[in-house]
Amino acid sequence: MSNIIKYKKKILNGDLLTKEEVEELLEEDITDLAATANEIRESLCGNKFDLCTIINGKSGRCQENCKYCAQSAHFDTDIIEYNILNSDRIINSAISNYNKGVHRFSVVTSGRALNNNEVDTLCKTYSKLKETCSIRLCASHGLLKYEDLKRLKDSGVTRYHNNLETSRKFFTKICTTHKYDDKIETIKNAKKAGIEICSGGIIGLGETMEDRIDMAFTLRELSVESVPVNILNPIKGTPLENQEILSYEEIIKTLALFRFILPTVQIRLAGGRTIISDKGKKALESGVNGAISGDMLTTLGIETSEDIKMIKNLGFEV
């Protein structure tokens, strides 16, 4: 019996794989690995597909030095900078996306964390939005404290996004202005506030497959509900502007392994799809059951109507 079949049976019996068992899958055929990851997804998660979209609610001037990010003030990337968007702009965007068939809508803001006035402003917007539209509200506002996260929860936010980005071991190679434990503390505080967690990372930063596996196991320990996987789209002006883009095979392998490690979570194909050949079609057949649609924060994405057509053609329910 191959390791793929053996470990699929173990997972479907309700058991979780160890890190050593996952490492045994590294040499398996990628096509078989992806197909089996998709079978695990279908058996444990069904065919429901979770589609979300984001809006850049505050852009640029970030004091953090994440090497991949166009919004860092440490780098010269020529992005447009602005403060918190007005309420009407955010609400209209949410309604528009809801009418297109999107399930979740997230306001994402630059910076280490919002200040009290910014939290107040967005909480008022979330409260209005909750009364106006049935779209599920997500938020990504940096390393907030418990009290602010509770305010978001009370305003209608159901899920908080805070990426680990990579493994603990590799993290210091991409950011030195905050710590891995700062992220973990934020995630734990959001859970304490009663908010679901969306946390994943970026692949293609120069990390190893071992780093990706380590991150996935940390996410499993944190019991997150959604794991977005971004593919690095190198931005001119950042330290990673010349980083080699991952092969599609490596992307598919990573996604499939994540399904073996995280059998019941939403694995969400996120930024970077425009740089791969089929806009993510093969990736969506590798254990994935969610995606971010539309434009990303500082890069272009894929039209929601195009995404929904592709997702339905693959047999998912949107």
From Swiss-Prot:
Domain of life: Bacteria
GO molecular function: 2 iron, 2 sulfur cluster binding; 4 iron, 4 sulfur cluster binding; biotin synthase activity; iron ion binding
Annotated keywords: 2Fe-2S, 4Fe-4S, Biotin biosynthesis, Iron, Iron-sulfur, Metal-binding, S-adenosyl-L-methionine, Transferase
EC number: 2.8.1.6
Binding, [2Fe-2S] cluster: S106, C138, C198, R268
Cofactor(s) essential for the protein: [4Fe-4S] cluster; [2Fe-2S] cluster
Role this protein plays: Catalyzes the conversion of dethiobiotin (DTB) to biotin by the insertion of a sulfur atom into dethiobiotin via a radical-based mechanism.
HAMAP family, alphabetized: BioB
Protein name (record): Biotin synthase
Organism: Clostridium botulinum (strain Hall / ATCC 3502 / NCTC 13319 / Type A)
